[in-house]
Amino acid sequence: MKTFREFVLECNSVQESSLNRIRTKSQKGGTAIVSAERGNKSLAENRARSQQMDRDIRGKGLPGATKVSGRYDERGDDGKTTKVKERSHVVSSGKMGKRKFSKAVKSLGKKYGQDSVLIQKKPGGSASLQATRKGGLGGAKSINVGKMQPGTTGEADTKIKGKTFTYG
């Protein structure tokens, strides 16, 4: 029989394993973070879009995504930026090549009207925000954001089970 202390330690290690799993995937191959949610949509509509994105990710031949929550500065159609919290999907490239993986993730971002998607093509390499619509990144096609940094927060960060990480 476990003591309460052993139980709490086991629960904490389980929470960290998901972040650890994402970090391991990032070190072993390409990963991307993409979302279907928009700040101007209702909660129910955003939830339905996220569920549809799950199906679309598998439909593109990618392995299933890990669901996370993220914060991002979203640029509206009028040019104003607003901070939004959204449900995001961390996708690994699986056996897909770098170029095909990048195109698949960008097409998902375009389909759901996202400003950009975060793509890390090389194992353990630096990631970049890739624009998926005109004006999404203020005119730039891509912005290099750096390597994954678990346990840190920034202006755009991601959280999974209480643990945060960012690229920078």
Where are these regions (language model features)?
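N-terminal, charge-rich interaction modules
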Residues: 2-66, 164-168
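Short, surface-exposed beta-edge/turn micro-motifs
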Residues: 28-31, 85-88, 113-116
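Short His-Asn-centered micro-motif
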Residues: 34-36, 92-94, 120-121
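Short, surface-exposed beta-strand/loop "edge" segments at domain boundaries and coil↔beta transitions
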Residues: 40-44, 96-100, 126
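Short, intrinsically disordered low-complexity segments
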Residues: 59-96
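Short, compact, well-ordered microdomains
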Residues: 99-124
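Short proline/glycine- and acidic-rich turn/helix-capping motifs at secondary-structure junctions
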Residues: 120-135
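A recognition module on extended beta-rich or small alphabeta surfaces enriched in W/G with H and D/E
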Residues: 140-168
